[in-house]
């Protein structure tokens, strides 16, 4: 997290300190408008010892807790700016639009859903209040029947009213009836007609702008936005053109580079090495990928319809408010005032209106229109950041001096009012800015109108909207439809034509300025006749005047110096293992990841809101192509880095020995950059080099002479976007804004200021020591700890924020920009933390629901198991009861010994049978031997008696065998088994003796013979 930076020199007189790292020090920009100057005051002596890099935020916040929050501009600064680290985040905070079109759509859908819920809750609350009033009236008049009837009637009326209001609210959400078929067909034909017109206009504009790029000309900020707008329209109108345009650009890039060398970044080198050409080609492809990624952010969502009802309502409101006789309600003013975007309003205002805004904010009113827009844009960003900080802390926490500074910074009356009045108007500003989301541009414009301070705020806004140009209404109407996915091609044509007109005006203004400079150079005042003795005496005075005039006119940093610094940085990039290209690819990957998150959030919100909005097909195709292109560029970069490593290893014999000691962080010294600039350009203006040096020093947070390549590149891009001429005063403000970003990460790519300056000198091959010193002084302002090392991200951030337009910022403006970027960095970090917390809470709730569901399933399973066990127990109890009632006959059986020989038992039984067969007299019922008779005698004389005796003998033998079998069964069967016994194999019959076998055979023969008889 960011820590505060301590500045050297005169800024040490400042005593402005923060009580909290996250909150207090963010409001420092409120005192930026004070006109007090303390440049003649000496430096402060009682500096606190510098802390180490590992100083924690908690310790720093505790040490800052007892100081005051705000001081006038005479005391503006930080005592702790020398320690802490700076990390200038390379995210969308530098851009004019903070997010993609999809993110804007998501925010709008959320706001609409929130407004609907608030309306329903308000109507329900009104219905409940009416019911309460009716019930109280019924209670008061309950003594009489007439009063009771009246109360019942009132209650029914209130219930009917609440039901009607809810029905109306429900009817609002019901889809409107479809138009007739003929009307719909005509609307579609008109839509496609304007779509074809827009297609041809886009092709013509893209061709012109691309031709300027191929010829080596730099596009201004407005031209760059126009190119992105027209390219996104081409992809939207013809989605499959992504498969044609993007591969066509990739394949023809080598051809373009060959026939149009002006599109290559100029490094003032004549080397024809293949590696150098490959690196330059990689830089161009990276620029193309960056442009396509920015175009992807500009592509809106897609809707089934083409006409927006809200856009039509806004058009009717804008037409009605411009007519003084038409009445406009306050609700309509607040509702549609939030639709005027700051960027749209600033781009559409005339020079007179811009100058009036600058006077209100006490800014410079001299300069081009582009310069006025730039400093107003910078100031509005600062005010928006301060509004969020003050709202978080509360207006009541500010003292009188802080209230005066905050009101003065917002163009409100600050002196001659009571403290309560100051708090009231500041609360009103913050409420309109944050809660009602009224743009600060309209609030500031309302201060420029000749309206009494006692007037109502809505009346001020009404008069302000009334004087806005027509272009503001067209842009806002298109933005409303675009956020809903309902793009009107006719309105888009009007906007593009208006932008083309403004581009021509800016080119004409730039051309006139160039002609004026050339005419001023050609005009020469005739020198008067001077004697030799006077000439020799005044030579020293003339040299001194020339030196002072050069230093006064060229104190600021111009776009030429920015290009010089950028070229020196790219030259150092090849020696620093292509850190610039690596950082660019890293940024592109982060941007694509953010875009993917926006798309996922759109899907979630769409399911809740039930709106038929989705990501367009062209955006999907373009996302896939850009993602594939970045992957290819990453592989090319790795290949190029490996080749450079091999070349260095082959050229240097001690490379292998020294490579292990190289720091993982790529360091670039300020002196190296200055030397590079000297090699690049041989000039006689040493002051110009001093400007770049000052810029690099300001980027050096820890003042070690080493800065990150990423920070330098971002600063170059920020200034180059506006193509600005920055004077010394604005440069100080700009650098102050960047130097306040105290948390610089040591794992970033950093660059030594000395190395950067050496490369600048070599590339320019210049002897302009004064200019080099000025550049070096600027670089030193980025060096917080004065160690000669700054981060490239600091420089890139500054230069990207300034942009492409031809303006010139002072040192003060650069310091203010550094401060602004620091505030945006902290607020963005807090927003990311809040978003991460919300996401983690959502995931925790989802996980909790899953755990609860699993617990419910587990508890259900346990209950089922308990029920099953209970049923089993009941069945067992029933079986036990049945066993007790039925007699157990198995217990009567004798238990067979477990290891008793069954064969022996069978043998004993066989012996019993043998004895029974041999001794029939043992049976008392058996017949005697005398009555039997012999065979022949029986056959002749006693036939019937002998036959009956044979039958009796057979029945006796059968009964004996049955009894023996029953006894054997009782011995074999178990006596304790209740259920069905298992299948028991029949044991093999043991071998019997020959005597038993013969007896059995004789017995069977006798029985058979008797049966036959």
Curated annotation (Swiss-Prot):
Gene3D superfamilies, per database record: EF-hand
Name the residue ranges with Gly residues bias. 935-945
Transit peptide endpoints, chain numbering: 1-60
Does the keyword field hold Transferase? no
Please give the start and end residues of each transmembrane region.
237-257
Stretches with biased composition (Low complexity): 946-959, 981-1004
This chain's protein is named Mitochondrial proton/calcium exchanger protein
Q: What is the lineage of its organism?
A: Eukaryota, Metazoa, Ecdysozoa, Arthropoda, Hexapoda
Gene from which the chain derives: Letm1
């Amino acid at each position: 997290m960011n820590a505060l930076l301590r500045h050297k020199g005169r800024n040490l007189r400042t005593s402005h300190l923060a009580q909290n790292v996250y909150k207090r020090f963010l409001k420092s920009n409120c005192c930026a408008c004070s006109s007090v100057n303390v440049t003649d005051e000496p430096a402060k002596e009682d500096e606190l010892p510098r802390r180490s890099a590992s100083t924690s935020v908690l310790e720093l916040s505790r040490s800052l807790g007892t100081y005051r929050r705000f001081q006038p501009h005479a005391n503006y600064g930080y005592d702790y700016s020398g320690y802490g680290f700076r990390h200038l985040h390379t995210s969308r905070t530098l851009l004019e639009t903070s997010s993609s079109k999809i993110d804007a759509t998501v925010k709008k859908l959320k706001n609409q859903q929130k407004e609907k819920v608030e309306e329903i809750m308000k109507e329900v609350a009104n219905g409940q209040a009416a019911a309460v009033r009716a019930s109280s009236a019924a209670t008061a008049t309950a003594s009489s029947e007439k009063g009771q009837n009246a109360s019942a009637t009132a209650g029914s009326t209130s219930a009917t009213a609440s039901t009607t209001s809810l029905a109306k609210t429900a009817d609002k959400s019901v889809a409107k009836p479809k138009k007739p078929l003929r009307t719909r067909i005509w609307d579609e034909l008109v839509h496609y007609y304007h779509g074809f017109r827009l297609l041809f206009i886009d092709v013509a504009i893209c061709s012109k702008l691309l031709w300027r790029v191929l010829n080596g000309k730099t596009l201004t900020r407005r031209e760059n936005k126009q190119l992105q707008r027209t390219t996104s329209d081409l992809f939207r109108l013809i989605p499959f053109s992504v498969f044609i345009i993007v591969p066509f650009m990739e394949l023809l890039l080598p051809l373009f580079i060959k026939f149009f060398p002006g599109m290559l970044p100029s490094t003032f080198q004549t080397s024809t090495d293949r590696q150098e050409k490959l690196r330059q080609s990689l830089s161009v492809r990276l620029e193309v990928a960056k442009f396509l990624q920015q175009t992807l952010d500009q592509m809106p969502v897609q809707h089934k319809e083409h006409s927006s009802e809200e856009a039509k309502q806004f058009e009717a409101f804008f037409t009605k408010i411009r007519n003084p006789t038409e009445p406009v309600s306050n609700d309509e003013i607040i509702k549609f005032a939030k639709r005027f975007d700051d960027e749209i309003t600033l781009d559409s205002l005339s020079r007179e209106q811009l100058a009036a805004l600058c006077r209100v904010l006490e800014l410079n009113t001299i300069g081009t229109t582009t310069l006025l827009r730039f400093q107003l844009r910078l100031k509005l960003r600062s005010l928006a950041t301060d509004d969020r900080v003050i709202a978080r802390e509360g207006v009541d926490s500010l003292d009188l001096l802080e209230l005066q500074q905050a009101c003065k910074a917002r163009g409100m009356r600050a002196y001659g009012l009571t403290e309560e009045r100051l708090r009231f108007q500041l609360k009103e500003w913050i409420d309109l800015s944050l809660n009602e989301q009224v743009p600060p541009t309209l609030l500031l414009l309302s201060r420029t109108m000749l309206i009494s301070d006692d007037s109502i705020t809505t009346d001020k806004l009404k008069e302000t909207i009334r004087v806005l140009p027509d272009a503001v209404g067209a842009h806002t109407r298109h933005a409303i439809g675009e956020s809903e996915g309902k793009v009107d091609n006719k309105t888009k044509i009007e906007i593009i034509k208006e932008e083309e007109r403004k581009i021509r005006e800016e080119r004409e203004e730039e051309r006139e300025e160039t002609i004026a400079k050339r005419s001023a150079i050609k005009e020469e005042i005739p020198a008067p006749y001077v004697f030799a003795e006077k000439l020799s005496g005044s030579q020293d005075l003339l040299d001194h005047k020339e030196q002072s005039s050069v230093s006064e006119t060229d104190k600021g940093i111009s776009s030429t110096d920015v290009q010089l610094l950028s070229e020196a940085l790219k030259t150092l990039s090849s020696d620093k293992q292509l850190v610039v290209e690596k950082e660019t690819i890293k940024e592109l990957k982060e941007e694509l990841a953010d875009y993917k998150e926006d798309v996922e959030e759109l899907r979630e919100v769409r399911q809740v809101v039930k709106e038929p909005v989705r990501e367009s097909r062209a955006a999907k195709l373009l996302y896939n192509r850009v993602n594939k292109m970045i992957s290819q560029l990453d592989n090319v970069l790795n290949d190029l880095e490996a080749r450079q490593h091999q070349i260095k290893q082959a050229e240097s014999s001690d490379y292998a020995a020294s490579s292990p000691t190289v720091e993982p962080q790529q360091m670039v010294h300020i002196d190296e950059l200055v030397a590079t600039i000297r090699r690049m350009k041989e000039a006689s203006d040493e002051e110009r080099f001093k400007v770049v040096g000052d810029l690099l020093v300001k980027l050096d947070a820890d003042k070690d002479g080493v800065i990150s390549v990423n920070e330098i590149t971002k600063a170059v891009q920020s200034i180059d976007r506006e193509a600005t001429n920055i004077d010394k005063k604005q440069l100080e403000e700009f650098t102050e804004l960047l130097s306040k970003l105290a948390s610089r990460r040591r794992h970033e790519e950093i660059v030594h200021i000395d190395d950067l300056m050496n490369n600048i000198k070599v590339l320019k091959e210049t002897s302009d020591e004064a200019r080099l010193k000025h550049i070096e002084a600027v670089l030193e302002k980025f060096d917080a700890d004065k160690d000669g090392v700054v981060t490239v991200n600091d420089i890139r951030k500054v230069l990207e924020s300034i942009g492409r337009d031809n303006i010139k910022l002072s040192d003060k403006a650069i310091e203010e920009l550094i401060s602004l970027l620091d505030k945006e960095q902290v607020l963005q970090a807090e927003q990311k933390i809040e978003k991460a917390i919300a996401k983690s809470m959502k995931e925790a709730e989802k996980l909790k629901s899953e755990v609860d569901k699993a617990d419910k399933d587990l508890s259900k399973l346990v209950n089922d198991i308990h029920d099953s066990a209970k049923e089993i127990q009941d069945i067992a109890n029933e079986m036990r009861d049945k066993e007790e009632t039925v007699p157990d006959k198995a217990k009567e059986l004798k238990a067979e010994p477990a290891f008793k020989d069954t064969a022996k038992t069978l043998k004993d039984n066989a012996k019993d049978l043998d004895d029974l067969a041999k001794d029939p007299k043992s049976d008392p019922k058996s017949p005697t031997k005398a009555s039997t008779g012999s065979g022949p005698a029986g056959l002749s004389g006693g036939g019937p008696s002998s036959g009956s005796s044979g039958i009796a003998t057979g029945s006796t033998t059968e009964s004996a065998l049955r009894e023996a079998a029953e006894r054997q069964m009782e011995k074999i069967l178990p006596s304790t088994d209740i259920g069905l016994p298992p299948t028991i194999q029949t044991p093999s019959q043991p071998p019997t003796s020959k005597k038993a076998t013969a007896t059995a055979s004789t017995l069977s023969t006798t029985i058979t013979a008797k049966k036959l008889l």
